[in-house]
Amino acid sequence: MTDSANNRPPRLPRREVHGVLLLDKPLGLSSNDALVRAKRLLRALKAGHTGTLDPLATGLLPLCFGEATKFSQDLLDADKTYEAVVRLGQKTTTGDAEGEVVVERPVSCDRAGLDAAIARFLGEIDQVPPMHSALKKDGRPLYEYARAGQTVERPARRVTIHAIDVLDCALPLAPSFTMRVKCSKGTYIRTLAEDIGEALGCGAHLTGLRRIAVGDLTLDGAVTLDQIDAQADEARPAMLAPVDALLRRCPPVTLSAEAMSRFLQGQRLAYRDLDPDSAPQEGVLARVYGGEPPKLLGVARMREGALRPERLVRL
C-alpha cells in the first residue's frame, strides 16, 4: 500500500437521509451524474431523481432521498415550467446550439407574427420527439441512431402546453426571443422551438434552456453542488426540503395516538376516528401526520367513508 493511500482519510459510511434536494443543475452535467455527486456529498443510502434534465439545460432538478423516493413518481408526472431562448432563421442537426446549422432562412416576422404562431401551440398538441433524445426504439436510445446518421420513425405523442409567455423579443432587429413555457410531462421544448420556427417559415433552434419549476417546486431555495460541497458534512442534510414538500397540494390530517398506531399497521380509519374539522373529502388524497410533535406518516385517500393508507413513510 502506498503512502498516499495510507494518508487518505477514511471513507465515511452512508447514512439515512430523508427529503428533497432542490438542485440547480449546471450546464453540461447529466441528471444521473448530478444525482451521483449529490448522493456522495450527502452520504445518502438511497436516492433517485424525478425525471431527467438535458445536459445542455440548467435549472431545477429535484432529487429525492430516503423516504421521499416513494413520491418521486408524482414529480415525474407533474407539469414543468421552462425558460427558453430561441434563435430564428436557423435549423440545426440537434435542434439546439450544439448541432450543425443545416438550414438557414431569412426571418421576416415581427412580434405580432410571433404571437400568432405561438398561439397555434397552446393546449393539447401532437409532438414528434426529437432524434436526439433518450427515448428508446427497439431497445436503443434515439440519440444512438442520430449519432450514426440514421433517422427512424417516431410516433407523435400528445402533450399539453398550458401557457407560453414571451419574456423578451428582439424582433425585428435580431432573430431571437425568450419564452416561458408551462407544459405537461414529456414535452420537448427543443421540438416546440423548432415547430414555432416552421410555423413562421424560417426554422429555429434552442440556444438556452432553464427549468424553473416542477409542479409546485421552484428554484426558490435551490442550491448548487458547489454550495453543498462548501458546507460541513454534518450540515448538508439540512439543505434538503422535508418529504412533505412534495405533498403541498394534499390537505393535512392529524391523527390521535390510537388512530396513528392503526394507520401505521396499514389499517383504514373510519370517519369517526378522524377530527371532523380536518377529515378530507371523498376521493381526496391527504397527507397524514401523527405523534408529538406531529410528523409525516404517509398519504391516504378517503374512500367510502374511510381513510385508506396508500403510502406509509418511516421518518
From Swiss-Prot:
Gene field: truB
Entry's family note: Belongs to the pseudouridine synthase TruB family. Type 1 subfamily.
Lineage, broadest ranks: Bacteria, Pseudomonadati, Pseudomonadota, Betaproteobacteria, Burkholderiales
Active-site residues (renumbered): 54
Residues spanning the signal sequence: none
Originating organism: Cupriavidus pinatubonensis (strain JMP 134 / LMG 1197)
InterPro entries in the record: PsdUridine_synth_cat_dom_sf, PsdUridine_synth_N, PUA-like_sf, PUA_sf, tRNA_psdUridine_synth_TruB, tRNA_sdUridine_synth_fam1_C, TruB_C
Family matches, as PANTHER family: PSEUDOURIDYLATE SYNTHASE TRUB1 (PTHR13767:SF2), TRNA-PSEUDOURIDINE SYNTHASE (PTHR13767)
Gene3D superfamilies: Pseudouridine synthase, PUA domain
Entry keyword set: Isomerase, tRNA processing
Function: Responsible for synthesis of pseudouridine from uracil-55 in the psi GC loop of transfer RNAs.
GO MF annotation terms: RNA binding; tRNA pseudouridine(55) synthase activity
Record's protein name: tRNA pseudouridine synthase B
GO annotation, biological process: mRNA pseudouridine synthesis; tRNA pseudouridine synthesis
Substrates-to-products reaction catalysed: uridine(55) in tRNA = pseudouridine(55) in tRNA
EC number in record: 5.4.99.25
